[in-house]
């Protein structure tokens, strides 16, 4: 069919795409309303689109349809592994830990000085403008970091042990289960003799 209007054709509906409604992706033009995942129909943008030939997908559906398959894939980011790569010649360096909590008396009364609480990491007064609450204590925003790797934390992404706070990854590495069979997920094969 001839293109009399001079506009580009949408990669999904094949109708003319005018400039005001155009989204471009890998040399193709789409209507904004047609720039959807072919499977789940979610709206896409330049950061969420994955292209396969002439088809467009969200990254999640693309991975399910065209990603690697088989044993060891699809376990997700939440699995634990104790392999540090020594068999491949990778040398593991421990990150320097942050200074542990120095406050031996963690009672609420002892932490209150002049109407403000003390930060368990630096023992300085914590005022409302810089206060973050985690593990039942008040911290400075700048002190609210993993005691091992220094990663900034949120009250929902921390784990605490012995008065110190850790990111979930460091907590799992240092205090989680260890040994063969842990962290493989529900569908893992179990080696038994």
Curated annotation (Swiss-Prot):
Gene3D superfamilies tied to this protein: Cysteine Rich Protein
UniProt keyword terms in alphabetical order: Acetylation, Isopeptide bond, LIM domain, Metal-binding, Nucleus, Phosphoprotein, Repeat, Ubl conjugation, Zinc
Cysteine disulfide links: none
Main location (coarse class): nucleus
SMART domains on file: LIM
GO terms for cellular component: actin cytoskeleton; nucleoplasm
One protein family per Pfam: LIM
Compartments (UniProt record): Nucleus
Domain of life per record: Eukaryota
Record motif Nuclear localization signal, residues: 64-69
Sites bearing Phosphoserine, chain numbering: 81, 192
Modified residues (N6-acetyllysine): 84, 112, 131, 137, 161
Cross-link (Glycyl lysine isopeptide (Lys-Gly) (interchain with G-Cter in SUMO2)): 91
Keyword Phosphoprotein applies: yes
Segments forming a coiled coil: none
Chain ranges of the LIM zinc-binding domain: 10-61, 119-170
GO molecular function: metal ion binding
GO biological process: actin cytoskeleton organization
Family annotation (PROSITE patterns): LIM_DOMAIN_1, LIM_DOMAIN_2
Function: Could play a role in neuronal development.
Oligomeric and partner information: Interacts with ASCC1; ASCC2 and TRIP4.
Name of the protein this chain belongs to: Cysteine and glycine-rich protein 1
Organism: Mus musculus (Mouse)
